[in-house]
């Protein structure tokens, strides 16, 4: 994926637009080459990494538990501006693409093949031979079904309206503008954020994006605290105390409990804690 540290340096509107333009133009050049190109995906391929893979003619996924693909930019309060909003709907259809982009979902290799994101899903032992065969075959990519083409073309408004309604149930635009920007840029500008500089400026330097990027780095720092200097292995947590029983806190508590940890949950009242316990059950 892209270097998230770079986002912290976007202190002017011009820098934000330059960052989007650089990736957009580069990946468009890759997508336009006449010779076959292939992305062999093994491990995490997220954000800018998947946008690079989408610019290739073929995408071959390695069937391992660690192979994950997604466009999770919305989790940082931003959008996939390097071609992901254009090419993902063309690959998998707009409904599936919106589901991935608006929720920041990641998928494994098998699901990537089923939904049409990956041309094939192969075990590690044959990945290099499979990549060679796919490139040399020069076969056309599997086309989108006719109805999906309509939804990605003349009927875009239908998908966009439905997506806005779903997003509105989870977040208000003034507090969380990124998913609304993704819908608008795809529906009105064919995924090209450069045509809507006011959206780029408003999203990239928004307080929401700054705070979510800060949260990301804090999470990464917390992960490092769980590492042990002991040569016997990493520190193994046994008990977790979660402060705040909102949607995120409640889901973290449930996730930890499902993995066998002893979990306690804290908030200002039982009325705030009860919904989290109900969801966990």
For every predicted segment, state its role.
Residues 84-95:
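Hydrophobic, secondary-structure "cap" segments at the distal end of domains
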Residues 231-281:
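Phosphate-binding active sites in nucleotide-utilizing proteins
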Residues 24, 30-76, 80, 244-247, ...:
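Glycine-rich beta-to-alpha active-site loop
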Residues 51-54, 60, 100-198, 214-231:
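Amphipathic alpha-helical segments at domain termini/boundaries
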Residues 1-26, 45, 75-77:
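Glycine- (often His-adjacent) and acidic-residue-rich active-site loop
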Residues 20, 39-46, 100-106:
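Glycine-rich beta-to-alpha transition loops that act as phosphate-gripper elements at the mouths
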